[in-house]
Amino acid sequence: PSKNAQEFFSRDEKIVDDAFIQNANEYLNSQKTDPAYTRITSSFMRAFDGKPKLEIPINGKRIFELREYQSHNELKALLKVQMFNEGEIAIFNATGLKSVFFGQTLIGPDIPNLTYMLVYENQEIRGKNWQAFLKHPNWDRMKNMEIYKDTVSKIVARFLDPAPYSQV
């Protein structure tokens, strides 16, 4: 996560920071025969007006869910961003879905898309909160609004465990 474009473009300089090196020792010293990853994919996103800053609402043991909503054209993608800004984020908050960030992908794979991250203490809480979201009367109203029909053509969800050196 970066506060601005300059911070984003200077991100590699942080790798030589002593604290980062200490916390990421296992990762940075992984062997070619047992790499920490296959390849890295990066995206440049614009934060949503409804959640302009990254937050970490839960510390300690937790799981992250990274969700990507792909759209079949740019207009539908913008309408889905609007849907979040005009009510869906508020429904998340009301039903216990704790968000880390929401971003519209400007540069990256599979555009047009938006990506957001949620955090939970465990899978059981995740299930309860999503059920509350699906039953919320404002969600039922919003999802049936004509303007928001067919805004998402594909959803990709990934579950992540935070590493000791993770910024989130």
PLM features per residue range, with description:
Residues P1-W139, Y148-V168:
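Short S/T/G/P-rich N-terminal loop/turn motif that feeds into the first structured element of a domain
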